[in-house]
């Protein structure tokens, strides 16, 4: 695998994303296919995200029942640089997905409280951590997520759960097809 540090910049801000979930036991064949003739975009790193929602989980419900015109709010960092936390809003429209990301002054997730967005109050609802690998294959960006752990809520007393799944995601600009 070649290693490439420069980021892939899409021609526009919208992209299509296709997500596949598989068991760890079956994931090796997919990783073999991905790594063959691909370029490694970044070193493997640990992603940590805190997701926000309303008290009645309206964002989650929209993501389950609506295919477009929805959004996610999260704070994210990379374990290798924990002092950098980003606020991200990921919107899904008929044209594709669009993500905004802005650096914050937070030093850890415990400092982040509730937030207002578009006149609505949102609360931290779940925390997830996973190891991510980033590849470029045939002009498509592919992410490969393993070691997934998660907990509901943000209280440190809440139990973490381990997932035996691997998530593979293809990220394509408008002109590409899977």
Q: In which residue ranges do the predicted regions lie?
A:
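Phosphate-end processing signature that detects enzymes handling 5′-triphosphorylated RNA
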Residues: 2-178
């Amino acid at each position: 695998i070649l290693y490439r540090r420069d980021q892939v910049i899409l021609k526009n801000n919208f992209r299509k994303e296709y997500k596949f979930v598989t068991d760890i036991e079956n994931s090796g064949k997919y990783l073999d296919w991905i790594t063959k003739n691909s370029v490694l975009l970044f070193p493997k790193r640990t992603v940590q995200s805190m997701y926000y929602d309303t008290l009645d989980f309206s964002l989650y419900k929209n993501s389950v029942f609506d295919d477009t015109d929805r959004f996610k709010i999260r704070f994210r960092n990379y374990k290798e640089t924990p002092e950098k936390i980003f606020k991200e809003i990921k919107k899904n429209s008929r044209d594709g997905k669009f993500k905004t990301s802005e650096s914050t002054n937070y030093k850890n997730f415990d400092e982040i409280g509730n937030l207002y967005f578009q006149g609505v109050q949102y609360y931290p609802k779940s925390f997830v951590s996973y190891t991510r690998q980033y590849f470029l294959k045939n002009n498509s960006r592919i992410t490969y997520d393993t070691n997934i752990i998660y907990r509901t809520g943000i209280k440190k007393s809440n139990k973490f759960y381990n997932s035996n799944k691997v998530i593979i995601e293809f990220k394509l600009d408008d002109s590409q097809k899977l």
